[in-house]
UniProtKB/Swiss-Prot annotation:
Gene Ontology terms describing biological process: intracellular signal transduction; protein ubiquitination
Pfam families with a match to the protein in the record: SOCS_box
ANK repeats: 146-176
Protein name (Swiss-Prot/TrEMBL): Ankyrin repeat and SOCS box protein 17
InterPro entries: Ankyrin_rpt-contain_sf, ASB17, SOCS_box, SOCS_box-like_dom_sf
UniProt domain comment: The SOCS box domain mediates the interaction with the Elongin BC complex, an adapter module in different E3 ubiquitin-protein ligase complexes.
Record keywords: ANK repeat, Ubl conjugation pathway
Stated role: May be a substrate-recognition component of a SCF-like ECS (Elongin-Cullin-SOCS-box protein) E3 ubiquitin-protein ligase complex which mediates the ubiquitination and subsequent proteasomal degradation of target proteins.
Organism: Canis lupus familiaris (Dog)
Keyword set includes Transport: no
Family label: Belongs to the ankyrin SOCS box (ASB) family.
Gene name as annotated: ASB17
Lineage: Eukaryota, Metazoa, Chordata, Craniata, Vertebrata
Amino acid sequence: MSKSSKLCRKTSCPRSNIFCNLIDKIVKRPSLQFLGQWGYHCYEPRIYRTLAKILRYVDLDGFDILLSDYIAFVEKSGYRFELNFNLEFTEICVNTILYWVFARKGNPDFVELLLKKTKDYVQDRSCNLALIWRTFTPVYCPSPLSGITPLLYVAQTRQSNILKILLQYGILEREKNPINIVITILLYPSRVRIMVDHELVDIQEDAKTCLVLCSRVLSAISIREIETQLSLGRRPIISNWLDYIPSTRYKDPCELSHLCRITIRAQLLTNNMLPNGIFSLQIPXRLQKYLNLES
């Protein structure tokens, strides 16, 4: 048996599949036929360059094809790898995809397409196809082991248009400690995006919008936890931040309409029907928009 066949055995994989073709190129290189011995740093550059060349100029249709190829590769490719190589290859691919979608493009349409294509896997955080739970490195680095999730990155950069999409798909509701996202929006150092003064204004407005959006999802926001951070010397990105969190999230009784929204969204979330399931409900369009966090 050849060295490359020891590494991977092909049973059925479309020749046009981007990731199958990439594997073929890697294992056929004489210098990389002992992948387990040399480690990911030997083949990571080729994976990144190949995917980056596609993602740099890809349109939505092309991105749809790339995601379909990745899903087919993971689910049905028939490849059998050494365990370490399999993990490393998929992690590098996911890191590259998320890096380009969130850190380089920052295009809401691409984010929404990624969520649509992978929503069937989102309930299993350990699944390689639950891309929204995988980590990536915002300043590209081959290993994403010390990376962050897309939701945390969007909170750090206060990309309100993308945060809204993530929230509509129930990503914040799936968080174990959603208050951490609120704290990140409010207190994370603004140098992530600030280059000139006018961008500071933009990021402050985005931070306000992000706080309002989170208030549409959560029933309670712990002001005490925020104030604890402030007492440690951390400075909020906006001075009047409390004006953008309704008093019904931390002091007054929560509105009945909001409690109903939370309950309905929770049921839809359990059945993995956010946000599309909202629009199949036999209710007025105004209430559908309310459930979809439009107001």
